[in-house]
Amino acid sequence: ISCSLVGSEMCIRDRLRGGKFGHVGHMESGMISTGETVSLKVDEAARRDTEKNHSATHLLQKALKTVLGSHVEQKGSLVTPDRLRFDFAHFQAMTADEIAQVEALVNKEIQAGLEVRTDVMDVEEAKKSGAMALFGEKYDQKVRVVSMGDFSKEFCGGTHVDNTNNLG
């Protein structure tokens, strides 16, 4: 999101803290005073690229669990318009064969053109449906669940593509 006043520019980034989304901004030039009217716009290209990378992390997590085992646990991630990083716990380094299997599975699900669906439901209903939640995370009574066909189902508040074939 960016904000422009004559002679001023502000950059605003979405942040997730404590399970809540917020917007954090900093002035790149100029000043904004209390009571001024500002105009905000979303950087659509950056948003589309970010949602692609964010959706890909869901496929990657499921592929890692499928290839390496259900013990794989997400420890962190970074999603930006130009890249993604997925940190996870596993008891040993991945072999070249395991990496190739994960890559092939992610590519298969991208090419399968899975519908990406979002539902809001009671947290207990979501858990019973098989949606994956982050261990130790606290959730509200109502949660957002993102499903990618029958392949991946997770608690998630992020932005996503409508279909996995939009990732290719």
Report the location of each language-model feature:
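A glycine- and charged-residue-rich anion-binding loop/surface
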Residues: 2-4, 8-168
